[in-house]
Structure formats: structure tokens, C-alpha cells
Design a protein with these regions (language model features):
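Canonical leucine-rich repeat
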Residues: 1, 22-24, 43-45, 64-66, ...
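LRR N-terminal entry segment and analogous cap-like coil->beta motifs
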Residues: 1-10
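Residues on the solvent-exposed faces and adjacent turns
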Residues: 5, 26, 47, 68, ...
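Low-complexity, intrinsically disordered tandem-repeat tracts enriched in small/polar residues
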Residues: 7, 18-20, 39-41, 49, ...
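Conserved hydrophobic beta-strand positions in leucine-rich repeat
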Residues: 10-14, 31-35, 52-56, 73-77, ...
């Protein structure tokens, strides 16, 4: 898929194909990218600083750099092979769906607008959500989390934390 000459593109829907590469360096105006369920092993979105919605789920990604994408409000990167995810620069995020990866840590302290977080089916041993006071939905099931403090999360309407190693749950 060659979109290098389509510099005015704001939306790309290329999901459920067999794409192994996607060159987006000339698509600086891109706001919405839906490239889920392909065969992508890498995704460079460093030049796509206008991105607000990204769904790259169901690929073969081992890493994802969203540090330049400070306007992101929704991030769907589940069902990949991602081992680390730094979302500390993405302070506009309201939804992060990074389940079914290989994450060993996830820092969400800077993401104070976060309302939905699904980080289940990873390898997390801890999750600090004290700063995420707007959180409505949290699914951190099937990790190795030892303790979980949801005392500051008074807006929670859904909490799923089964199949962890919890010895302490502060509600």
C-alpha cells in the first residue's frame, strides 16, 4: 500500500489485510489510522503528530513508539507482541487497550484523562493507577500483579482483576 503521494490523507482504514509494511512518513496530516489485523512487524508513526486515534491491534509488533503522538486520545494495540509501551507523553489519552501483549511494566501516572484501561493478559507485576481518578473501566486480569490500590478511583464502574497474584486489594 503506497500512500506516499497522498499527503492530504487524514484517515486511513487498511485493516484486515496482509500488510507487512506501512510507510506513513509523508502523511503528516493523518489523524485516524486503523491498520489492525495485518502482519505488520513494525510501525513508524513518528511523523504523524496529528494522530488522535490509532488501532494497530492484531499484528506482529514487538514495540510501538507513540512518544511523538501527543494528541492521541485512543490507543488500541492489543494482541501483538509488545514488550514495553511508553505512554508518558500521551496526556490526552482517554482509552488504552494494550491487552494480550508481553508487557512487564506500564506507567500511566501522566495519563490523568484516562477513563478506560485494559492491560489484561500481560506480564505486569504492578500497576499504579492512583493518579487516574477519572478511570471508569479497568481490566488488569491475567497478569502477575501483587497489589492493587483503587482507593483514588472513585469513578470506577467496572473492575476486573482476576488471575493475578494479588495479596492486597484496596477498594
Amino acid at each position: 500500500l503506497d500512500v506516499s503521494k497522498n499527503t492530504e490523507l487524514e484517515w486511513i482504514y487498511c485493516y484486515k489485510n496482509a500488510l507487512t509494511a506501512l510507510d506513513l512518513r509523508y502523511n503528516a496530516r493523518l489523524k485516524w489510522l486503523f491498520c489492525y489485523e495485518n502482519a505488520l512487524t513494525s510501525l513508524d508513526i513518528g511523523n504523524n503528530r496529528e494522530l488522535t486515534e490509532l488501532d494497530c491491534s492484531g499484528n506482529l509488533l514487538t514495540s510501538l513508539d507513540v512518544s511523538c503522538n501527543t494528541k492521541l486520545t485512543s490507543l488500541f494495540c492489543y494482541d501483538n507482541r509488545i514488550t514495553s509501551l511508553d505512554i508518558s507523553n500521551n496526556m490526552e489519552l482517554t482509552g488504552v487497550f494494550c491487552y494480550k501483549n508481553s508487557l512487564t511494566s506500564l506507567a500511566v501516572g501522566n495519563n490523568t484523562q484516562l477513563k478506560n484501561l485494559n492491560c489484561s493478559h500481560n506480564r505486569l507485576t504492578s500497576l499504579d493507577i492512583k493518579q487516574n481518578t477519572l478511570l471508569n473501566n479497568l481490566n488488569c486480569s491475567e497478569n502477575s500483579i501483587l497489589s492493587l490500590d483503587v482507593g483514588n478511583n472513585t469513578e470506577l464502574t467496572f473492575l476486573s482483576c482476576y488471575k493475578n497474584r494479588l495479596t492486597m486489594l484496596d477498594i
